Amino acid sequence: MCALLLLSLASNSYAQAKKMRGLKDEVKNRFLMGVALTDAQVADRFPEKTEIIKRHFNSIVAENTMKSGFLQPREGEFNFEAADAFVEFGLENKMFIIGHTLIWHSQLPDWFCVDSDGKNVSADVLKKRMKAHIQTVVGRYKGKVKGWDVVNEAIEGDGSFRKSKFYEILGEEFIELAFKYAHEVDPNAELYYNDYGMDGEKKRDGVVALVKNLKKKRIRIDGVGMQGHMGLVHPDIAEFEKSINAFSSAGVKVMITEWDMSALPSAWGASANISDTQEFNAKYNPYTESLPEGVSEKWNARMEEFFRLFLRHSNSISRVAFWGVSDDDSWLNNFPMRGRTDYALAFSRDLKPKPFVEKILKGKVREKALPKTK
């Protein structure tokens, strides 16, 4: 009788533990499962979302809080309150914390690259401003933030360098300097280049060339973040896989960052450039109440297909991160046109896991890892 009771208790405990397993547990020892957080989520204003975050993810990135426009809106005046809270949340929950992003042409404070007359500053002035910003921010979180998106979106679709203010003033040297400045202040932090549209052949080649150039000059770069902004048609999974292989072969880790998949129709291509906005058109907002079953099935099948790809390349991929917790969090509700209702993330608006997530949690999505690329 006693033995039967113990067996029953053990069985119930196993079932309960199985029920509480999250995405991070299902991919344990394959790659980190990450998610982007808002300030409100860090402040625990939505306790049910907090539980999802703690259960399913072991890596976090701030959606906006650590961008330069938020951290240093005026030269020399840093606002660390929200960033401190974000980092503290990660430390309390033993998560791998990502800093996003140190140098980016967008969401950049107006003063950063120009003087009081609005003219480009000299190369020396910009170098000093870059160094002061990077080393103040990285230095504050030394040993706490484990990886930094050092430079974000500096390469165009044709593989050339984006003609940003940084490039106008410093040329491609601005990228080298950003990585150097970050490494100087925290030699143990991982340093990444992050960009969208990485499935494109010319952009892929441009990023590989960038990585090889940094390595040739003995400048530390640990990984490439492939922003996973997807749709029901783009990107082509075979081309996406080619990029994973290319970046891994260049000698860096690969991360799937900012992963989401729009379920809505598009007439403007696959851009994730936040300046590429459109006027609202109801034609491109057809699912205001719910997602039709057929569209939902297609969406989940495609998300599962990509997740299987990530598992297959888990010897090259170190992290897979969703760009938000649930559908209501997604930036795609307001990009490229504001006021749409999209269904882009792993959890629904009522915080239920999508079918492809359920399959992962039930152990039904598995893929043997390929040998690590040399």
Feature-to-residue mapping (PLM):
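Acidic-and-aromatic substrate-binding clefts and catalytic sites of carbohydrate-active enzymes
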Residues: A36-P47, S68-E81, I155-S160, G197-G206, ...
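Short, acidic/polar
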Residues: A40-H56, R129-V137, K203-L214, M303-L309
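Aromatic-lined carbohydrate-recognition surfaces of secreted/lumenal glycan-active proteins
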Residues: G34-D39, V150, A178-K203, M255-E258, ...
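Acidic (Asp/Glu)-rich catalytic clusters
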Residues: K24-K28, P47-N58, D84-F96, V138-K142, ...
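Aromatic-rich peripheral "rim/lid" segments of glycoside hydrolase catalytic domains that contact
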Residues: K19, L23, K119, R140, ...
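Bacterial Sec-dependent N-terminal signal peptides
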Residues: M1-K19
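Boundary/entry segment of secreted carbohydrate-active catalytic domains
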Residues: A17-S59, E63
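Substrate-binding cleft and catalytic face of glycoside hydrolase catalytic domains
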Residues: M20, R55, S59-P73, A82-D199, ...
